Amino acid sequence: KETAAAKFERQHMDSSTSSASSSNYCNQMMKSRDMTKDRCKPVNTFVHZSLABVZAVCSZKBVACKBGZTBCYZSYSTMSITBCRZTGSSKYPBCAYKTTZAZKHIIVACZGBPYVPVHFBASV
């Protein structure tokens, strides 16, 4: 079974590019990373930084998560991210996404030993 940490990497890490390559980025990535298998995942964020830099956020600024849990951390520095948001015309299995690039602080939830990101909470 896929671990929570591995799922985070699959759904949110794209260290191989510094930003979204094209307006088609989300359509390609959401499909290739298995987020359109059973349904269209409505919203997802990819982070274009090294895994080490994203894992380091787990020891950065302690903040509350959206759901009120306290295991979230905000990055001290901004990171290159791409937001993928389902378009109005998107219909499973033909999932369609709008690609938006940004430089923002990320907020992740961390757990385990080693203490690593398991959930992408928000970007600010």
From Swiss-Prot:
Indicate the residues that form the catalytic site. Answer: H12 (proton acceptor), H119 (proton donor)
Any one Gene Ontology biological process term? defense response to Gram-positive bacterium
- Top-tier EC class: lyase
Q: Which domain of life is it from?
A: Eukaryota
Any one GO molecular-function label of the UniProt entry: lyase activity
Disulfide links within the chain: C26-C84, C40-C95, C58-C110, C65-C72
What tissues express this gene product?
Pancreas.
State where composition is biased (Basic and acidic residues). Answer: 1-13
Assembly, in brief, is:
Monomer. Interacts with and forms tight 1:1 complexes with RNH1. Dimerization of two such complexes may occur. Interaction with RNH1 inhibits this protein.
Q: Which family does it belong to?
A: Belongs to the pancreatic ribonuclease family.
Q: What is this protein called?
A: Ribonuclease pancreatic
